């Protein structure tokens, strides 16, 4: 086993040859490299599969031995400072490695078909392989310096993939927004790393924890400075995991290809922030107030993400806000000290959310043949509906992921979310009420997405659809090269329109949409022309990863179920995490009071079913047919209560549709303030600083010109004036010193 650990350093570097060879091939032999492009995709999957097998083997060894391994190379700079590089294999590393590789393999297989007609196919696979390398390097890092290096590489890859179709201004702006927002968190992370090095003199995790605990125990640190450094470290995780208030980049990141949305939201970028807090939890837990801050940020994000998902028309943006809310649950669990519950939910949510994103990609892929290659159309749930008849496999798997995220047993997220909800009662009743209420909201908005997508009739074939009249329709060509056809503000809303939160109000589509009675897709590269009037199911290359992730969603929750009756121990996750739990000095209690569990489970499932019922009543097609009946209309007659109810509903809709006005606040005050400061600085530089410099030059020029005209341009006059000035100076000098 020791020999196996010695070769674990190679894990991050196994996928690295693919992006290097693709880059070299495209530079030296572009035609030949493109002609064998599927070979490069196969190599990406093969190398990541090798990493997956290696990671699974290491995990089995850890479960059996309950140990961790660290190896460090020291780079001695001088006697006072040495920079160490190494790798750390512990339960957190092995869990993240398996998560990254399994989800990454499924996404790569899926992408082979999804990106088949894109000119950037090879570039996409190069970015994806480098993304996997960066994330594997992050989770195997043994010190804060390595963490920061791979942290930046993970960010770089995510920016490249978010802005993959960079010729579209909306994608380029989304990439820029993600970059700028994460710069704030990354700068805080760097300052926090340097601050803790100044306190402890070490970057290595084990040394850092030991030295810092001794300093705290002996009361030898400034708690205000330590708390500030901890907050700065946490700021990096807040930005990366899209926690309030640095969450604004996440919905715009949906401008990238759908497969990368699945990878970012399941196992890479947003998981990096949760990983960092989990890795540094032994540090945070001994600092007053920092754990409470983590839990507060988590519970705010839980509620905010759920409310922002309520009115989304874009299927990917709805799932993005769902990710934000679920990451808030994980952050809440870490803030409460529930290390096991947080990682359990990280695992179950990763597979469920990857399933949902790949399922949405399959739906978008089928809708593109009907409405065209425009994200504003193909991702708009107002143009969907009735897809259960056309994409039955995608419908079943999407329903599976939806039920899992709602917390319906026996699916994966039920087991992990229930643990967090139960722990929240012990931590804070207020937090518990918010967390449980948000569980109902989660069931509501997830089933809203499902019903708008799969139930009813296909709205794309009707001249009207339930969307916004002024929605900007951005065109994306087959190769991802077309730009924006029409510029429009993302958050523009016509308040004169009678829009209700739960209503299925119809709005006229533009002229091009009305003429699309028999839409078809023609691809010049194909040997034949394909004409489609209805969406069609994706092929097996895309369905296979969805099917596998569906199996994970069904069964992965079993690893954390403590079925240890009569002394048996079948809780795999607790045994797996035993070394990390011991490091946190927590008691690993694998036993479960099944009566207490069933009572809490009944409550959580009842709340979830209530949310599903409300969504079904408001969005299921039966409501559209019943609401015209006189009996139903008698309940919705205009009156003071009805008007008040409409105002409340419209207020909630505006809050959700306008992203809680946070983006508008940042745009007006932060962006506007910075631009105002820049304009003032520009004015001060041009008018004051340059004015002083130019003024000296102008004055010198005027004086010189005046002297020139006084002298008349004759050398004899200049000599006369010079001698006169010298004589006057000597006379004054003589008179002054002769009187002393």
Curated annotation (Swiss-Prot):
Q: What does this protein do?
A: NDH shuttles electrons from NAD(P)H:plastoquinone, via FMN and iron-sulfur (Fe-S) centers, to quinones in the photosynthetic chain and possibly in a chloroplast respiratory chain. The immediate electron acceptor for the enzyme in this species is believed to be plastoquinone. Couples the redox reaction to proton translocation, and thus conserves the redox energy in a proton gradient.
Q: Which InterPro entries match?
A: NADH_UbQ_OxRdtase_chlpt_su5_C (IPR002128), NADHpl_OxRdtase_5_subgr (IPR018393), ND/Mrp_TM (IPR001750), NU5C-like (IPR003945), Proton_antipo_N (IPR001516)
Its UniProt entry gives the catalysed reaction(s) as: a plastoquinone + NADH + (n+1) H(+)(in) = a plastoquinol + NAD(+) + n H(+)(out); a plastoquinone + NADPH + (n+1) H(+)(in) = a plastoquinol + NADP(+) + n H(+)(out)
Q: What is the lineage of its organism?
A: Eukaryota, Viridiplantae, Streptophyta, Embryophyta, Tracheophyta
Broad class of the protein's primary localization: plastid
Q: Which GO terms describe its biological process?
A: ATP synthesis coupled electron transport
E.C. designation(s)? 7.1.1.-
Keyword annotations from UniProtKB, A to Z: Chloroplast, Membrane, NAD, NADP, Plastid, Plastoquinone, Quinone, Thylakoid, Translocase, Transmembrane, Transmembrane helix, Transport
Q: Which NCBIfam families match?
A: NDH_I_L, PRK06590.1
Q: What does the UniProt entry say about where the protein is found? A: Plastid, Chloroplast thylakoid membrane
Taxonomically, which superkingdom?
Answer: Eukaryota
What is the protein name for this chain?
NAD(P)H-quinone oxidoreductase subunit 5, chloroplastic
Query: Which family does the similarity line name?
Result: Belongs to the complex I subunit 5 family.
- PANTHER family (alphabetical): NADH-UBIQUINONE OXIDOREDUCTASE CHAIN 5
- What sections of the protein cross the membrane? 9-29, 40-60, 89-109, 125-145, 147-167, 185-205, 219-239, 258-278, 286-306, 327-347, 354-374, 396-416, 425-445, 543-563, 602-622, 717-737
- Name which cysteines form disulfide bonds: none
One Gene Ontology MF term: quinone binding
The record's GO CC annotations read: chloroplast thylakoid membrane
Subunit composition and interactions: NDH is composed of at least 16 different subunits, 5 of which are encoded in the nucleus.
Its membrane topology is listed as: Multi-pass membrane protein
């Amino acid at each position: 086993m020791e020999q196996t650990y010695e070769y674990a350093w190679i894990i991050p570097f196994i996928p690295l040859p693919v992006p290097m060879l693709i880059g070299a091939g495209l530079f030296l032999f572009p035609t030949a490299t493109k002609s064998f492009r599927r070979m490069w995709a196969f190599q990406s999957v093969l190398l990541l599969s090798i990493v997956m097998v290696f990671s699974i083997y290491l995990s089995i060894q850890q479960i059996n031995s309950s140990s961790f391994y660290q190896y460090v190379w020291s780079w001695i700079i001088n006697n006072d400072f040495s920079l160490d590089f190494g790798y750390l294999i512990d339960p957190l590393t092995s869990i993240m490695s398996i998560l990254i590789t399994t989800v990454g393999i499924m996404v790569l297989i899926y992408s082979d078909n999804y990106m088949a007609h894109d000119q950037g196919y090879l570039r996409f696979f190069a970015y994806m392989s480098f993304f996997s390398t960066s994330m594997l390097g992050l989770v195997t890092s043994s010190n804060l310096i390595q963490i920061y290096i791979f942290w930046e590489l993970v960010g770089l890859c995510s920016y490249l993939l978010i802005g993959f179709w960079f010729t579209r201004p909306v994608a380029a702006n989304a990439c820029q927004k993600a970059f700028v927002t994460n710069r704030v968190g990354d700068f805080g992370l760097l300052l926090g790393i340097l601050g803790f090095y100044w306190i402890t003199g070490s970057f290595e995790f084990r040394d850092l924890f030991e030295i810092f605990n001794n300093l705290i125990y002996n009361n030898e640190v400034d708690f205000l400075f330590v708390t500030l450094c901890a907050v700065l470290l946490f700021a990096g995780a807040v930005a990366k995991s899209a926690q309030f208030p640095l969450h604004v980049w996440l919905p715009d990141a949906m401008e990238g290809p759908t497969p990368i949305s699945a990878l970012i939201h399941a196992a890479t970028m947003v998981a990096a922030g949760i990983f960092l807090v989990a890795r540094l939890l032994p540090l945070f837990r001994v600092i007053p107030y920092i754990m409470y801050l983590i839990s507060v940020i988590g519970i705010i994000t839980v509620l905010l993400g759920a409310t922002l998902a309520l009115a989304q028309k874009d299927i990917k943006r709805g799932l993005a806000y769902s990710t934000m809310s679920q990451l808030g649950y994980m952050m809440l669990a870490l803030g409460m000290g529930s290390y096991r519950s947080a990682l359990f939910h990280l695992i179950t949510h990763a597979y469920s959310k990857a399933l949902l994103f790949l399922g949405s990609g399959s739906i978008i892929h089928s809708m593109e043949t009907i409405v065209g290659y425009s994200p504003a159309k193909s991702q708009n749930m107002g143009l969907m509906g009735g897809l259960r008849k056309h994409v039955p496999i995608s419908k079943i798997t999407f329903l599976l992921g939806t039920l899992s995220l709602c917390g319906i047993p026996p699916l994966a997220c039920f087991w992990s979310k229930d643990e967090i909800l139960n722990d929240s009662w012990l931590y804070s009743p207020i937090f518990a009420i918010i967390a449980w209420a948000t569980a109902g909201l989660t069931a509501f908005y997830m089933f809203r997405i499902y019903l708008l997508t799969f139930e009813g009739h296909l709205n794309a074939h009707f001249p009207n659809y339930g969307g916004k009249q002024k929605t900007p329709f951005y065109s994306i060509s087959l190769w991802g090269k077309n730009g924006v056809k029409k510029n429009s503000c993302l958050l523009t809303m016509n308040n004169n329109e009678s829009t209700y939160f739960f209503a299925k109000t119809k709005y006229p589509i533009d002229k091009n949409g009305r003429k699309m009675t028999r839409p078809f897709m023609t691809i010049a590269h194909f040997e034949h022309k394909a004409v489609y009037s209805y969406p069609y199911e994706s092929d097996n290359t895309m369905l296979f990863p969805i099917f596998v992730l569906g199996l994970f969603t069904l069964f992965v929750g079993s690893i954390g179920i403590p079925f240890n009756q009569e002394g048996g121990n079948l809780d795999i996750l607790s045994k797996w995490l035993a070394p990390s739990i011991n490091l946190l000095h927590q008691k690993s209690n694998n036993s479960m009071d099944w009566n207490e569990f069933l009572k809490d489970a009944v409550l959580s499932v009842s709340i979830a079913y209530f949310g599903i019922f409300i969504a079904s009543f408001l969005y299921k097609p039966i409501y559209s047919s019943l609401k015209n009946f006189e009996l139903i209309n008698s309940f919705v007659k205009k009156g003071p209560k009805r008007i008040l109810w409409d105002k409340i509903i419209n207020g909630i809709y505006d809050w959700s549709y306008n992203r809680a006005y946070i983006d508008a606040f940042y745009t007006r005050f932060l962006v506007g303030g910075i631009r105002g400061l820049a304009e003032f600085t520009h004015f001060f530089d041009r008018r004051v600083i340059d004015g002083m410099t130019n003024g000296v030059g102008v004055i010198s020029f005027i004086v010189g010109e005046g002297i020139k005209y006084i002298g008349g341009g004759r050398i004899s006059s200049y000599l006369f004036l010079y001698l006169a000035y010298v004589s006057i100076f000597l006379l004054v000098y003589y008179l002054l010193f002769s009187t002393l």
